[in-house]
């Protein structure tokens, strides 16, 4: 299947291109390694780094992405352009700030591992959750749609924010309601090594019923 970009020169994208770019716009950024893995999931199987680089180079030529070397000896970062966002129906687009980029990439890694394309689990982005939740509610970094339709809120904790702030965020997510029940059946904290102990301690101070709904695990590395 071929999908035409709405431009005067009408360059064309494959269905896999379109699916990958949709994912990338939703996540706002990913590493070149993550995009290469994603392309394999969306196609017939894993592809080489060289093949992934060729596909991303074509997207760059079409003005749909930018590749930037942000950190020394780390994979380049791929960010969609406004043209890619417009193709996906967005009227506005803003790249992730450098200060939040590492956090964004970890969220992309979690989605890629936990909710890979074709799996039985789905994913809601932070922006999608913001549209769902009432004003003033705590917005998680994402949410896993479990096979039974239940939502698991996902929080990425890479740096210490202090026990008080962690407790406020945790209890806020646990308290979000949907009808007569909890919107989030569980809250999953994925933590850098330096903050696992702190987040676990905050969880362990909660009442037993609330503790049972909070899972604390190491954050996947990039």
Language-model region placement:
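Catalytic cores of nucleic-acid endonucleases
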Residues: 158-208
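Nuclease-adjacent, charged terminal/linker segments that flank catalytic cores
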Residues: 1-89, 94
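Metal-dependent nuclease catalytic cores in nucleic-acid-processing enzymes
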Residues: 108-114, 176
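Active-site metal-binding core of divalent-cation-utilizing nuclease and nuclease-like domains
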Residues: 68, 100, 112-153, 158-165
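Charged, structured surface patches that assemble and position nucleic-acid processing machinery
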Residues: 205-222
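Acidic-and-aromatic substrate-binding clefts and catalytic sites of carbohydrate-active enzymes
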Residues: 46, 131-135, 194-196
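A short, highly charged nucleic-acid-interacting micro-segment common to nuclease
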Residues: 91-107
């Amino acid at each position: 299947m071929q999908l035409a970009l709405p431009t005067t020169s009408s360059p064309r994208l494959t269905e896999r291109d379109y699916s990958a770019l949709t994912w990338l716009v939703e996540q706002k950024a990913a590493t070149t390694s993550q995009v290469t893995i994603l392309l394999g999931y969306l196609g017939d199987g894993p592809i080489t780094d060289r093949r992934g680089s060729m596909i991303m180079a074509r997207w760059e030529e079409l003005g749909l992405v930018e590749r930037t070397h942000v950190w020394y000896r780390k994979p380049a970062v791929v960010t969609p352009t406004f043209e890619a966002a417009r193709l996906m129906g967005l009227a506005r687009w803003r790249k992730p700030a450098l200060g939040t980029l590492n956090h964004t990439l970890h969220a992309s890694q979690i989605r890629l591992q936990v909710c890979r394309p074709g799996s039985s689990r789905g994913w809601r982005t932070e922006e999608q959750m913001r549209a769902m939740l009432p004003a003033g509610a705590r917005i998680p970094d994402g949410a896993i749609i479990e096979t039974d339709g239940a939502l698991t809120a996902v929080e990425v904790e890479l740096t210490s924010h202090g026990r008080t702030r962690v407790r406020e965020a945790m209890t806020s997510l646990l308290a979000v309601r949907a009808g007569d029940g909890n919107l989030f059946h569980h809250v999953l904290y994925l933590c850098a090594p330096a903050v696992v102990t702190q987040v676990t301690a905050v969880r362990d101070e909660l009442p037993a019923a609330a503790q049972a709904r909070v899972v604390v695990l190491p954050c996947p590395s990039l």
